[in-house]
């Protein structure tokens, strides 16, 4: 392959933003790949992470209040704990305008929707794995939840 063709292919890769190009001709094969653009966006994402960190720093004022309530509640409450199957954001209703899936004192059957945990823009419906009466909802709407964190108590 002619060196001028190869130079034009390199220019094409640089201008178009594609990361890899492979051309086969009778004379041979040329593969041009760029790894630098993949690294640059990752660095930008990591640079954005500290910006997110100060936002939760404002939230600790709320977290201690919730943390104080949750241990006291779990000490007093007995029953079946419905736990979060993933890290995400807890929602009591399918949308902000909609009615909550369940309220304290409400009877639930196995398979009834209790809440939603949003993870990576996916709404994951959490269902009752035991029939009974909702005794307590341990998380406030819109709060972050950790994996295996108790969400709801069913008795």
Curated annotation (Swiss-Prot):
One Gene Ontology cellular component: acetyl-CoA carboxylase complex
Pathway recorded for this protein: Lipid metabolism; fatty acid biosynthesis
Coiled-coil boundaries: none
Record-listed N6-biotinyllysine modification sites: 121
InterPro entries, per database record: AcCoA_biotinCC, Biotin_BS, Biotin_Carboxyl_Carrier/Decarb, Biotin_lipoyl, Single_hybrid_motif
Keyword Metal-binding carried by entry: no
UniProt keyword Transcription regulation, yes or no: no
Domain Biotinyl-binding: 72-155
Entry keyword set: Biotin, Fatty acid biosynthesis, Fatty acid metabolism, Lipid biosynthesis, Lipid metabolism
Summary of the function given for this chain in its UniProt record: This protein is a component of the acetyl coenzyme A carboxylase complex; first, biotin carboxylase catalyzes the carboxylation of the carrier protein and then the transcarboxylase transfers the carboxyl group to form malonyl-CoA.
Quaternary assembly: Homodimer.
Protein name: Biotin carboxyl carrier protein of acetyl-CoA carboxylase
Organism of derivation: Haemophilus influenzae (strain ATCC 51907 / DSM 11121 / KW20 / Rd)
């Amino acid at each position: 392959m002619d060196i001028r063709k190869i130079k034009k292919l390199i220019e094409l890769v640089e201008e178009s933003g594609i990361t890899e190009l492979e051309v086969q001709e009778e004379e041979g094969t040329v593969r041009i790949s760029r790894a630098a653009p993949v690294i640059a966006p990752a660095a930008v994402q990591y640079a954005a992470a500290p910006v997110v960190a100060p936002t939760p720093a404002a939230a600790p004022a709320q977290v201690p209040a919730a943390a104080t309530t949750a241990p006291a509640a779990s000490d007093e409450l007995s029953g079946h704990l419905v736990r979060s199957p993933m890290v995400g954001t807890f929602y009591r209703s399918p949308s902000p305008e909609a009615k909550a899936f369940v309220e304290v004192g409400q009877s639930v059957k196995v398979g009834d929707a209790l809440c939603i945990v949003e993870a990576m823009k996916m709404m994951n419906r959490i269902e009752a794995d035991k029939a009974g009466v909702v005794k307590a909802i341990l998380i406030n709407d819109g709060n972050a939840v950790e994996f295996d964190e108790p969400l709801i108590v069913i008795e």
